[in-house]
């Protein structure tokens, strides 16, 4: 199904003469998918830009080197350097193992060496307000840094423990100012209202869905219906999207 989804995206790009279209592979954790490298090769053969969002735990220097010339950007999600904060947020495995900063620093160096752009995503919540993330960003040297206000999708993750993690707008702004990193780096701030209706996702089974007014809603399946027809039904806010990505080069 994944290749059929890619074919549908490729058709949409060609029909609409989109020359710099990009497929962003996210999850879950995409590096757990055993056929990921086959999928990357398949997308690359179609000359579509590729980006990957990962927690970085399964990255290796060898894999990064093999992606050189195929993957344009690797995004690493890192919300905290304190193990307790990571566990509170949920960034740990079943044995409560959390990410290793030294490993991420090595991977960041490998990404830069491979000529791949590095992006860092941090979700800002009550659990990491006191974290010194600036030192992490200085060590990783990202080309792009996105600070994301924790987002609640009411029919997906509206649990008491999630609601308890929501910071005030003032707390979010304080986190941004304390951890602002802009050394040869594009800083992007993403707040809840800026995310709603401004991006869509396609799962491996072809289902197209969007975050609409705080709810995750499905609008069709790209394997069985042209994306152009599905997009015509989406409550997609292109102005919001353009504002988020007008200066994006990676």
Language model features: what each stretch is:
Residues 21-25, 50-52, 74-76, 118-122, ...:
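Hydrophobic faces of well-ordered beta-strands that scaffold small-molecule active sites
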Residues 4, 8-9, 71-82:
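Short, compositionally biased "basic patch" segments
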Residues 10-17, 66-71, 113, 137-141:
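Acidic (Asp/Glu)-rich catalytic clusters
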Residues 79, 83-197, 204, 209, ...:
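Radical SAM enzyme [4Fe-4S]-AdoMet core and its adjacent flexible, acidic
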Residues 1-52, 58-65:
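Conserved alpha-helical substructure of the radical SAM core
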Residues 21-25, 199-206:
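N-terminal pre-triad scaffold of radical SAM enzymes
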Residues 32, 60, 126-130, 230:
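Alpha-helix N-cap/loop-to-helix initiation residues
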Residues 232-250:
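Cysteine/selenocysteine-centered motifs that mediate thiol-based redox chemistry or coordinate metal-sulfur cofactors
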């Amino acid at each position: 199904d994944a290749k059929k989804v890619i074919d549908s995206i490729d058709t949409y790009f060609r029909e609409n003469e989109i020359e710099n279209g990009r497929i962003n592979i996210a999850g879950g954790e995409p590096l757990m998918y055993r056929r990921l490298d086959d999928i990357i090769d398949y997308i690359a053969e179609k000359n579509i830009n590729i980006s990957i969002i990962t927690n970085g735990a399964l990255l290796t220097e060898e894999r990064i080197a093999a992606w050189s010339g195929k993957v344009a950007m690797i995004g690493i999600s890192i919300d905290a350097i304190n193990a307790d904060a990571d566990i509170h947020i949920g960034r740990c495995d079943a044995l409560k193992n959390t990410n290793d900063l030294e490993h991420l620093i090595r991977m960041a160096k490998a990404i830069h060496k491979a000529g791949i752009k590095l992006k860092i995503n941090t979700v800002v919540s009550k659990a990491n307000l006191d974290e010194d993330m600036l030192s992490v960003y200085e060590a990783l040297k990202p080309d792009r840094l996105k600070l994301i206000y924790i987002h609640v999708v009411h029919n997906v993750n509206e649990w008491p423990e999630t609601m308890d993690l929501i910071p005030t707008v003032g707390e979010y702004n304080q986190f941004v100012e304390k951890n602002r990193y802009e050394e040869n780096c594009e800083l992007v701030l993403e707040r809840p209202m800026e995310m709603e209706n401004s991006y869509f996702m396609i799962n491996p089974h072809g289902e197209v869905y969007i975050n609409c007014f705080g709810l995750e809603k499905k609008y069709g399946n790209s394997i069985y219906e042209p994306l152009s027809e599905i997009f015509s039904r989406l409550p997609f806010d292109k102005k919001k999207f353009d504002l988020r990505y007008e200066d994006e080069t990676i």
